[in-house]
């Protein structure tokens, strides 16, 4: 596909990567391949897992699903953001300190491996107010969830994942009535991508859809 775009440029990501240049330096084909793979993985497998968590949350909070179903286009962005905040599929991420660091009276020497918990950070009441409540109408201020990480290792597929979740929620909510859990969900390991192995649900199809 990279070779194809070199001969026939399009208005797409691969063409933009081919044309990208900084101080005369361009990406190699190997680097482009890694970047495209990272975007696809970040926007497909992980999004499927996050969507499953979202459906589970809405099944457990039917009043929120009803709110979304009434105004799907208007509420989809807030719904996706609240799902990402409340139940991230990457609850634990590893980081390495690049220099000695002192934080809240704890000393971390350079090259210390730190396991950061986005799940806990995303429910910090100092940042999100009533953080333990799953509420798509809540004003969370300017705080952004740490679900996608931060800094140099911020998730490359973040924007794609958000767009896919918003589209899915806007499409499903007005079509799936009476959404509820039909059994106990079975979770995958919390390490890496924390998805759902099984998610029993029941719903009825909206008559006008």
Question: Can you annotate each of these PLM segments?
Answer:
Residues 1-209:
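Cytochrome P450
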């Amino acid at each position: 596909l990279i070779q194809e775009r070199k001969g026939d440029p399009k208005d797409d990501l691969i063409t933009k990567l081919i044309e990208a240049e900084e101080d005369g330096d361009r990406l190699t084909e190997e680097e482009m391949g890694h970047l495209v793979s990272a975007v696809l993985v970040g926007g497909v497998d992980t999004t499927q897992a996050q969507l499953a968590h979202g459906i589970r949350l809405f099944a457990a909070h039917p009043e929120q699903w009803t709110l979304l179903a009434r105004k799907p286009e208007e509420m989809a962005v807030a719904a996706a953001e609240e799902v990402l905040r409340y139940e991230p599929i990457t609850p634990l991420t590893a980081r390495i300190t690049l220099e000695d660091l002192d934080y809240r009276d704890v000393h971390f020497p350079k090259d210390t491996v730190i396991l950061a918990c986005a799940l806990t950070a995303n429910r910090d009441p100092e940042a999100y107010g009533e953080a333990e409540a799953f509420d798509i109408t809540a004003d969370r201020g300017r705080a952004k969830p740490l679900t996608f990480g931060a800094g140099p290792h911020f998730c490359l597929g973040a924007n794609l994942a958000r767009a896919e979740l918003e589209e899915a929620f806007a499409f499903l909510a007005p079509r799936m009535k009476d959404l509820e859990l039909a059994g106990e969900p079975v979770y995958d390991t919390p390490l890496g991508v924390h998805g759902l192995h099984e998610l029993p649900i029941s719903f009825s199809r909206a008559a006008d859809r």
